[in-house]
Amino acid sequence: MVMLDLPYPPSTNRYYRHVGFRTLISREGRTFRTNVCALLAGGGPRKPPVGGRIALCMDAFPPDNRRRDLDNLQKSVLDALQHAGVYEDDSQVDLLLTRRRQVVPAGRLSVEVLDLPLQRCPLCGSDMTNVGMN
């Protein structure tokens, strides 16, 4: 399990920009990605990147009361965490939970990276031992 506190991410709409037929990471997106890498680098020794199936649980604390779609912040966070070496590839994420929390100045995002299978739901604590088992 890895717990991370990150700055509030730009939405997907601001994370990428389009130039002709190419899609690039915007200046704001590169700044966010650099900040995430710097925060994780300052945390001392870490485990090597997670290589198996994982769950990501995010608590989003927005910077203000504007209307925001939670799914618009997920991609930028996934991209930054992969770039920072938290896991090898976005395709490892089998469970992605995001919940909106109260407004805090400047906003922030708490992220928990968990190895699958889970015994308990990280949000409600209910039993998950049989979820996804066929």
Where are these regions (language model features)?
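Acidic, proline/glycine-enriched N-terminal capping motif
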Residues: 1-134
